[in-house]
Amino acid sequence: MRQLIKKLYMGIIRFLNLIYKKKKVQSKHIVIMMTFAEDVCPIVEALYPKGYAITVIGNEANRKYLQQFETINFLPAGNKRVFKHIKALSSAKVIVIDTYYLMLGGLKKKPNQTIIQTWHAAGALKQFGLTDHQVDLSNAKMVSQYRKVYNATDKYLVGGEPMVECFKASFEATDDQFLRTGLPRLVPYTRLDVVKRQNELKKQYGIEGKVAIYVPTYREHKQANRQIDKSQFEAALPEYTLLSKLHPSIATEDQTAINLQSMMILADVIISDYSSLAIEASILDKPSLFYVYDEAQYEEERGLNTFYKAIPEAYKAYTETELIEKLK
């Protein structure tokens, strides 16, 4: 059924390609597809003052932030609005994306259009793309669909050679596609005194002592996302306040509303698993612990790369009790 729905969806996009085939590309029009705000907001903020016509396709949660930019055209994400999305994309000179968007596999890109990927991570510890164990490489139709989406990308923003290696393996990217500019999501950290801002945030939120944040990666099923018992954690470690934020795709109401970058600044220690946020923490010179209760299962189902496997066991905890002991 899922494959049938995808086939129908791609058929609609091909039909829309025909409708907007003659729509001219506007040299100052940029479309930004926003799933992870922290990855593309710095791009919006940099481009807006330069007079570009910017269209953002994103979640309703981001509309309020974008209202400060009076001339930005906001289109809510969702399959019901695919007609408006393709219309906007058909006239864009540059399209900026931050993750995998199925529609790009069916979009008929015009010769003078460029798609730039600013992947939603400072690095990678898990497999993704064609190296993800969930991708059945023997299924030619599945692999072909993934490749159509990956091949739509012209350029990748990267912050270091390890991600070049990952993109080559996962997306079959080539050397000429990499823009070694660094990542927009890291720019805000370079513009502030992190220690000073950490103290300001602790005061703002009424937090005394140390802060531990728990920021696990995406898992396919919500029931597989184990949360840390906040009461038990703080009773065992009274000098700590624990804040949790799950991956945006599986977020719950039981987590903090503080935005991710503020949490990273607030933190004295980052608890993650296979998430790239541990790499981001190193840029902030903050220690990380890896709570990897399902390491064997995750390796089997999704796959963990050589960078994860190089992490010493001393930094890994497989139970909540072990995690607490390592923090004492």
What residues fall within each predicted segment?
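Membrane-proximal basic amphipathic "stem/tether" segments
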Residues: 1-36
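A short, charged/proline- and glycine-enriched loop
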Residues: 22-31, 52, 112, 207-210, ...
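Active-site and donor-binding regions of nucleotide-sugar-utilizing enzymes
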Residues: 31-189
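Conserved catalytic-core segment of nucleotide-activated headgroup transferases in glycan assembly
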Residues: 39-47, 169-170, 180-253, 317
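Short active-site oxyanion
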Residues: 50-55, 151-156, 241, 266-269, ...
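Donor nucleotide-activated moiety binding/catalytic core segment of transferases
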Residues: 76-90, 248-279, 283-284, 295, ...
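Structural alpha-helical scaffold elements that stabilize or flank donor/cofactor-binding regions
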Residues: 85-88, 108, 149, 205, ...
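Catalytic binding pocket for nucleotide-activated donors in carbohydrate/polymer assembly enzymes
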Residues: 276-328
